[in-house]
């Protein structure tokens, strides 16, 4: 299973490449778990960089493993915080926490409300409030998005829209939560890799190894 392989590679890199002595640098963060096999991984990295820059004035140092050099991994411990994009990066983040006392936050956010909550969590670790204007903008957008469910009811929608979400574990988890928040019933949550490397996976997220079984599930959606 490729997710297990990614987990082991990330651990191998952070166990062997970083120098023993690391001098902390201010306003620097790392991203862990940006596998280029992930859907729109480069876009996610770009989005996290923009969020951290606007909210806290932080810049990215090392990104495992997207456009990162051996030297950057060698001094990965100089950053103040690690942002773990995927569950596969969690064990590596634990290693770095033990080696260099580096805190971390797990998962990239989906949706305005989740982004706001995520920024507040990061801010608590950094000891810095996120940018006030940015938070106000996100809060307004979150309110507008949440009102979509109410508008649909006012327009006389008789049937709740249903969806199936398929992808990597963190995408399925985050996107499903966002869809529920706007009034869409997520009927099926299908992970495209096994859950062996996931710590305490959500019970309603399934891994189906047989493609025909997955197709049969999706065919059922045509009748909803």
What are the functions of these language-model segments?
Residues 1-224:
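An N-terminal assembly and electron-transfer interface module characteristic of large anaerobic redox
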């Amino acid at each position: 299973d490729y997710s297990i392989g990614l987990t082991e590679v990330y651990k191998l890199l952070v166990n062997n490449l970083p120098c023993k002595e690391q001098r902390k640098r201010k306003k620097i963060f790392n991203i862990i778990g940006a596998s280029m096999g992930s859907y729109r991984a480069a876009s996610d990295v770009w989005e996290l960089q923009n969020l951290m820059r606007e909210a806290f004035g932080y810049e990215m140092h090392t990104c495992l493993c997207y456009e990162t050099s051996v030297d950057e991994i060698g001094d990965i411990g100089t950053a103040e915080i690690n942002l773990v994009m995927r569950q596969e990066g969690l064990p590596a983040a634990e290693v770095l926490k033990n080696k260099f006392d580096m805190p971390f936050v797990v998962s990239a956010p989906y949706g305005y409300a989740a982004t706001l909550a995520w920024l507040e969590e990061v801010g608590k670790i950094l000891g810095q409030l996120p940018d006030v204007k940015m938070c106000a903008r996100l809060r307004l957008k979150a309110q507008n998005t949440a009102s979509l469910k109410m508008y649909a009811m006012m327009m006389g929608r008789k049937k709740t829209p249903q969806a199936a979400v398929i992808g990597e574990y963190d995408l399925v988890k985050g996107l499903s939560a966002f869809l529920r928040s706007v009034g869409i019933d997520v009927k099926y949550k299908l992970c495209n890799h096994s859950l062996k490397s996931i710590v305490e996976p959500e019970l309603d997220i399934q891994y189906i190894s047989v493609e025909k079984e997955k197709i049969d599930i999706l065919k059922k959606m045509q009748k909803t």
